[in-house]
Design a protein with these regions (language model features):
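Mature, structured domains of secreted/extracytosolic soluble proteins
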Residues: 26-711
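Bacterial Sec-dependent N-terminal signal peptides
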Residues: 1-45
Length: 711
């Protein structure tokens, strides 16, 4: 039995083999590429470049970096090589001539790595895929990518900056003492890919491209090829397929583009703007960067700490983790122009940078007069003042700032910037945005409006705080800057100086004295404390001069009633010192210094008497005339003996030497004391007996008093 069972098992296995053989044979796939390569598949990347005979410089980079075998083997690379002619132009732009490969060999190892890696992506991308991004939530986002990270690393761009090239602020003094500083880039630089797919998705037009490329030649808007930074890849030189990746052959060397900070600092025509921008540069210590650099270059190669040059900005550096700098008090940029990855794959920034000539023209013009009067020189403008100016020249998003949108583009406060294509002298492509050098300045609305001079002068600090209080949540914030920043109206803004604001005749107590003989007159002396206006209240001497101090109003944070009193008085003052200049329906509306109106109507409904023209204009309120006080005059500046009168975009500003005040005497008491008005006064007063006799008469039951006194 045992032998018989073994025979049956052998027979069964033989049958399995016989039956299974045809099945195994049927699994044979006749796929033709098992034994041969596709005809469209080229050589490996290295062989392709070598066989062409036009890429000796690029291959010198490859060989010097030991990358030959990598580019011969299978892998997944996308490369943007340039031929030897392009490298000759590249070296010539740097003042170098000679044999291309020799010039490559003479470069430092880090320079070679930085240049080579900037032309390589560690994935395979056909040209139409360069604008795609992947999203965990939405899958593939097609056509929305503008930039990509390359194989290049900030570790190959460490620089030692000598004292002369360091920012001039105190933040960098310690490095001047050390004879310089080691600085790392703020992130690894990305490369821009201007593809037809991105053009279509973003709406970037041919006219837009002409502005972006202003100053360049032979850079046409291309819907078939594409650009890498500003290097052109023509349609017949893209998507070269090799065994281990794709080549897109550029007309120029694909080198790491500078960031916006580097563009501005290296362009001679932008020196003035660059100097202001550098006031916000800060040596930021990042331990992980310092460790990475020293590990990369080896122990002892760099003994000092390595810092990152960053800029105070509202996007990612508005507070100091070490609490050494009050950044918001110091002032910030809108975003960091040195941040190489700002905007990510799909967006970046824009900066409109006025040329030195444009900055000088603005400074010397009537629009910049108030800054010149306050500070004398661009470099003397405080950082918290100039930061607002610089922010207005930054745009957070390239996509929302395409040239075809400039006619509707608004600044950070929502006002039209009024940038025109003809304003642009030249455009620069940076790794993190576009820098447009312009022949115009675009000041913020605060520096265009009539209250602009008030904000910067050291003699109008009280009125400055009254007009624009940065604490928008303060219930007593009058917010008059929102009214005065309207560019659709024209204003006269009369601004009492700080000295004038120290002598305000309180209208309530002075009215009691003028009308009823109750002498409890007070003089209020306004000043700024902790950013808010407060007042010292003084008794009044018999001759109307300031007497003893009675109390201080609004200084205590718990003194809410006092704060309300101060706000009430300030509102009266502001209403009295604003005259609308272009109200066609008001005969007493116009510019006070043109000599056409002897009287003008204020915003609050008071009437001012006006005399003189231009800088010699004089103004008087009814209360001033009533008290026999002289007219208010435009003050003379100490610096250049010039009158403090300013032409602004929405009107004229006058610094005056006294507060204008309404009459203290009421109409009733004025008319009752003047015999010339007696008959009319008696008519107005009427006869109470008439109303008493008619009160019970049914024939006159519909007669009601015009004025009623509430109980």
């Amino acid at each position: 039995m045992h032998a018989e069972r073994n025979v049956k098992q052998v027979v069964r296995w033989c049958l399995y083999i016989v039956l299974g053989f045809p099945l195994l044979n049927s699994c044979k796939d006749d796929y033709i590429y098992d034994n041969e390569e596709p005809s469209w598949l080229g050589a490996n990347i290295y062989e392709y470049l070598e066989s062409s005979g036009q890429f000796d410089c690029y291959l010198a980079l490859v060989n010097d970096l030991g990358y030959k075998e990598t580019l011969r083997l299978t892998g997944s690379k996308t490369m943007f090589p340039a031929n030897d002619e392009a490298f000759s132009r590249y070296f010539l732009s740097k003042g170098l001539t000679g044999d291309g490969p020799t010039l490559i060999h003479n470069m430092s190892a880090s320079e070679k790595r930085y240049l080579f890696n900037s032309s390589m992506l560690n994935m395979t991308y056909l040209s139409h895929m360069l604008a795609n991004v992947s999203s965990n939530d939405q899958g593939i986002g097609e056509g929305i990518a503008l930039r990509r990270a390359t194989s290049a690393s900030y570790l190959d761009s460490i620089s030692f900056v000598k004292p002369a090239a360091l920012p001039k602020t105190a933040f960098w003094n310690r490095f001047r003492e050390r004879k310089g500083a080691y600085l790392a880039d703020n992130g690894s630089k990305m490369v821009l890919y201007w593809t037809p797919e991105f053009f279509s998705t973003s709406g970037l037009t041919e006219a837009d491209w002409a502005v972006i490329m202003k100053g360049e030649t032979d850079k046409p808007y291309d819907t078939q090829g594409f650009y890498v930074n500003d290097a052109h890849v023509e349609s017949n030189r893209k998507d070269v397929t090799c065994k281990n990746g794709y080549l897109h052959i550029a007309d120029d060397v694909v080198a790491p583009a500078p960031n916006m900070s580097e563009v501005i600092n290296s362009t001679a025509e932008m020196n003035t703007f660059a100097g202001l921008m550098e006031k916000f540069a800060y040596p930021y210590y990042d331990g992980s960067v310092d460790d990475a650099v020293k590990a990369y270059y080896g122990a002892g190669s760099i003994e000092d700490s390595v810092f990152v040059k960053r800029y105070f900005n509202q996007t990612d550096f508005s507070s100091d983790p070490d609490e050494k700098v009050d950044i918001m008090g110091y002032g910030t940029l809108a975003f960091d122009p040195s941040n190489n990855v700002y905007g990510g794959n799909t967006d970046m920034g824009v900066m409109f940078v006025p040329s030195d000539a444009a900055m000088e023209d603005y400074w010397e013009s009537s629009r910049g007069q108030f800054l010149r009067d306050s500070y004398g020189d661009w470099d003397e403008v405080p950082t918290n003042v100039i930061s607002v100016f610089l922010q207005n020249h930054q745009r957070l998003s390239f996509l929302t700032s395409l040239p075809h949108n400039w006619d509707i583009m608004t600044d950070n406060a929502g006002f039209e910037m009024s940038v025109k294509e003809e304003d642009v002298q030249k455009a620069y492509i940076a790794c993190n945005g576009i820098v447009y050098m312009t022949d115009k300045v675009y000041p913020p609305v605060d520096y265009q409006a009539v209250y602009g001079p008030v904000l910067t002068a050291d003699t109008t600090t009280t009125m400055s705080a009254a007009i624009k209080n940065d604490d928008m949540d303060d219930v007593n914030n009058l917010k008059y800057h929102l009214y005065l920043r309207s560019m659709d109206n024209q204003y006269n803004l009369l601004v009492p100086t700080d000295d004038a604001m120290a002598n305000y005749r309180d209208p309530i107590t002075w009215a009691l004295w003028a009308n009823e003989g109750v002498d409890k007159r007070e003089i209020w002396s306004f000043y700024v404390k902790m950013g808010k206006v407060v007042a010292d209240v003084y008794d009044t001497n018999e001759d109307g001069s300031k007497g003893a101090l009675l109390r201080t109003v609004g200084a205590d944070a718990l003194d809410t009633e006092g704060a309300e009193e101060v706000a009430n008085r300030l509102q009266d003052i502001l209403e009295m010192h604003i005259v609308v200049a272009d109200n066609e329906d008001e005969p007493l509306s116009g510019f006070i210094d043109e000599g056409t109106l002897p009287y003008v109507l204020t915003k609050g409904g008071s009437v001012l008497a006006v005399s003189g023209t231009g800088e010699q204009v004089k103004v008087q309120g009814g209360g001033d005339r009533e008290m026999g006080l002289p007219e208010a005059e435009v003050v003379t500046l100490e610096k250049d003996n010039r009158k403090a009168r300013y032409e602004m975009d929405n009107g004229r500003t006058f610094f005056i030497d006294r507060i204008l005040q309404d009459p203290f005497k009421s109409v009733y008491y004025t008319m009752s004391a003047n015999e010339d008005y007696r008959a009319f006064f008696d008519l107005l007063v009427g006869n109470d007996d008439v109303f008493l006799s008619l009160a019970d008469n049914e024939d006159y039951k519909d007669i009601e008093p015009i004025f009623e006194t509430s109980e």
